[in-house]
Every structure is written in C-alpha cells, then in structure tokens.
Amino acid sequence: MADLQAILDSIHTDILPRIGEGKVADYIPELAKVDPRQFGMAIVTVDGKVYRVGDADIAFSIQSISKVFMLTLALGKVGESLWKRVGREPSGSAFNSIVQLEHEGGIPRNPFINAGAIAVSDVVMAGHAPREAIGELLRFVRYLADDESITIDDKVARSETQTGYRNVALANFMRAYRNLDHPVDHVLGVYFHQCALSMSCEQLARAGLFLAARGSNPMTGHSVVSPKRARRINALMLTCGHYDGSGDFAYHVGLPGKSGVGGGIFAVAPGIASIAVWSPGLNKVGNSQLGAVALEMLAARTGWSVFGD
C-alpha cells in the first residue's frame, strides 16, 4: 500500500493555503460559533493501521453522518421492510425539501435526507422512549469505535430543537401521511440528539470501519452487519450521501460517503480503509468544501475510487 502518512501530509500541505474556505452552518446557532479555520483527516485501514493529519483529534458535530449509524440500527431491527417507509433514490432536491415529500405521499426519497432520517429514527424508537433510542445509538457508536468517550453535545441538540422548524414541518407531514408511529416531538427529540453526536475524525473513521471490511470490525473481530448489507449501505452512500451534491461527489471522488453540515465527511474505500475528514466551511449544497477537495486528492493519489484508478 502507498505511504498513506506521506499522502495525508501532502494533502494537508496543499489544503493549508485554502483553510477557511466555505461558510459554516449559521442556521444552527451552536454551529455558527465554530471556527472555520480548521482541518483534520484520519484513515483507518482494514488491517488496523491509523493515519491522521491536522485537527484529526478534535471532536465536531457529525450531524447527518449519524444517519449512516441510525440506518444500520433500523435495518437490524426491521430488515428490508424499512423500504416500505423510505425510498432508495437520490433526491435531487435540498436535504430539507418539503415539496418532494408532499408530491410523493409522505414517503421520503432516501434515508439520508432529513425526512428520510426522521422516518428511520421513528423505526429505531420501536415503541421505546426517546431517551432509550438515543442511548441505544450512543452505545452502538461507542461499540463500533471501541471508545467510551464519545458523547452527544446537548448544546447543539438544544440549538437544533429551538430552530428546527422545517424538520418539525417534515415530521408533521409524515405523521399526517401515517409514516410516523410515534409522537412528532418524541421522534424529533431522537433526531436532534443523533445529529448532535460529537466525534473526532479518528473516532468516526474507526466507527465506520465495518463498512470498509464487509460488515465486520477487523479491529475487534465483531460482525456488525452481513457483507450484503454493508455493500448496500455503501451503495446508498455513493448515490445519496451528499444531498443534491451526490452526483458531483461521485464524479470527483468516486467513494461511498456521507457528509454533515458540521463540516465532516465520512467515506469508505471498500476492502481498504475508512476515512473521515473535517473542515467546517460548507459549499452551497451543505457539504464541506475543503473536505470534498481533500477526498478528491486522496482518491487521485491512492487510486481508491470504486470506478478504478
């Protein structure tokens, strides 16, 4: 394998002059306070080696990247029947679009847009109190990363609860179409807390390693999902993981990935490694501007694109 530390160092050197590009997510008050002049990146290979550069050990709000872990939990609970409640197609619309949801009868286009993730949170609740569902997610992510220090940032969760009017609208829409089983405020309580998961690049890359290793965590030896399910989650990340910038990300980077408005991007090189990058400045579709640039550099310098080198 190429000298990954040297590649990471070269990416960091090339990114440094551009640090601060993009715009932080100012519609969530707590995220508006984050200094955009930060950049971190971590790679964990399937043989357990860890490579990092920059601010890879600083915890940030993973936001929509949490949807990958919630989807994994939901599929574990209800299997393929999940797809009766949420689709598997790219949306082509903004991640918080209401128009599409109404047009399609309350069935969200995919599990990674906000409406789809809210439906997935409803499935994970499975009759339990919000606190129990949040606890289940936190235990799961700590287990995946083998790190008990991972937490949920209550300030961020509160900040989203106070300003998430559009998510309230999406949830009420789905409840009206009978695609939510639990009270709207309970489901949103889970959703806002899952998005407030706080992790570093290294923790995130460790937690997602099972998706690079056919569903098992090679560092612990634990099977998380079947190889088939890991492959399908990766397929969804490739086609739907970056909102209406998913096609552009596939074109430039060519790896399954999931972004979040906290500036993080999680990506998978199947059979090789999991990758996490963080830079808080976002582009116009809500994805980390420099994070995407760094991953494009990584794919070019390693030949890891799933479409060939």
UniProtKB/Swiss-Prot annotation:
Keyword Signal: no
Example of a GO MF term: glutaminase activity
Positions with a binding annotation for substrate: 64, 114, 160, 167, 191, 243, 261
Catalytic activity, EC: 3.5.1.2
Record key words, sorted: Hydrolase
SUPFAM superfamilies recorded: beta-lactamase/transpeptidase-like
Highest taxon of the lineage: Bacteria
Broad EC category: hydrolase
Cited Pfam families: Glutaminase
InterPro entries reported in the protein's UniProt record: Beta-lactam/transpept-like (IPR012338), Glutaminase (IPR015868)
The reaction(s) this protein catalyses: L-glutamine + H2O = L-glutamate + NH4(+)
Entry keyword annotation includes Hydrolase: yes
Transmembrane domains' residue ranges: none
GO biological process terms on file: glutamate biosynthetic process; glutamine catabolic process
Cystine crosslinks: none
Description of how the protein assembles with itself and partners: Homotetramer.
HAMAP family named in the record: Glutaminase
Family statement: Belongs to the glutaminase family.
Name this polypeptide is given: Glutaminase
Primary gene name: glsA
